[in-house]
A protein has these predicted regions:
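Acidic/histidine-rich helix-loop elements
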Residues: 13-28, 83-94, 126-134, 208-217
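Divalent metal-dependent hydrolysis catalytic cores, especially in the metallo-beta-lactamase
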Residues: 31-60, 70-80, 112-126, 154, ...
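Metal-associated gating/positioning segment near the N- to mid-region
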Residues: 2-65, 84-86
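His/Asp/Glu-enriched, well-ordered alpha-helical/loop segment
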Residues: 150, 222-282
């Protein structure tokens, strides 16, 4: 039976104002907001949600409530990010590998479902081909993934740029999130590793017509990522639909992702197999 899933959401965010959204949950997770979110997903037929994490416990609380709505909910707790690099606004930071290893061990003991790592910057939506910062050193990427796997935890990686995705895939990362600016080599590495790619096209496609960023650059970014989605599908790679719901202009329950994936040429078989693997691994 086909499962309706969103493989990348953020319960802590609302798609409108990330700072105000975080304030909503800072003292304690807002049950009214979370219940409304889960109810809306259930009414749309979703039965599986995978959270990208937050350090205030909104995703953890959503997991506790989700069964009431017939939803299987998976969360890493807080995403783990290197101090001074992208992700600190929402995740838990570390400075050394030993500190990271301690956070992984703690997450496992607390019952988190998997590990989320931040290993690259974000797309600059006003400059095609530009990321907000370089990716993490390949050796460090491999080490982070190895440590998490040795703890028995699957790894979800925020990763943009082929230089970042290739070592992550070669290290056996379980899923790559976003994946802007890839290459044929990066696609092959993901295919060989059985890595599921969750392109989150909505985070780019939903910006069109909003007037906040360069329309030309947004369209070029979407076209570029869509091209690699098509190529990955042709080589038999595994894809899964994840909206990054909660990101600006991506409300919870957004249906744009599957439309954008199909427009890019993603085959239903690739999406079904990729979603099934996400559910199995995470």
């Amino acid at each position: 039976m086909q499962v309706k899933a969103d493989c990348h959401i953020h319960a802590v965010l609302d798609g409108v104002d990330w700072k105000a959204a975080i304030r909503r949950h800072e003292r304690k997770p807002d049950d009214a907001f979370l219940r409304n979110m889960l109810r809306n997903y259930a009414e749309q037929g979703y039965t599986y949600l995978r959270d990208g994490g937050d350090r205030w416990g909104a995703g953890i609380r959503a997991r506790e409530l989700a069964a009431e709505y017939g939803i299987t909910y998976r969360t890493p707790g807080a995403p783990l990010c290197q101090k001074g690099h992208y992700g600190g606004f929402i995740g838990t930071t570390y400075e050394t590998v030993a500190e990271y290893a301690g956070l992984v061990s703690s997450a496992r003991k607390k019952g988190c479902d998997f590990i989320k790592i931040m290993i690259s910057g974000l797309m600059d939506f006003n400059q095609f081909g530009v990321l907000t910062e370089p990716g993490m050193h390949p050796a460090r990427i491999r080490e982070l993934i190895r440590i998490a796997h040795e703890e028995g935890m699957a790894v979800m990686a925020h990763a943009n740029g082929y230089e970042t995705v290739i070592p992550a895939a070669e290290a056996g990362v379980d899923s790559v999130e976003h994946g802007a600016y890839l290459s044929e080599e990066a696609l092959f590495a993901m295919k060989e590793a059985g890595t599921v790619w969750v392109p989150t096209l909505s985070t780019v496609g939903n910006l069109r017509g909003k007037g906040r960023f360069s329309e030309t650059d947004i369209c070029r970014i979407l076209e570029n990522t869509s091209y690699y989605v098509n190529q990955f599908c042709k080589m038999g790679g595994l894809l899964a639909s994840g909206t990054d719901a909660g990101a600006w202009a991506v409300p919870h329950g957004s249906e744009t992702e599957i439309l954008l994936l199909h427009q890019a040429g993603a085959a239903q078989e690739s999406l079904q197999k990729g979603t099934a693997k996400i559910i199995e691994k995470f």
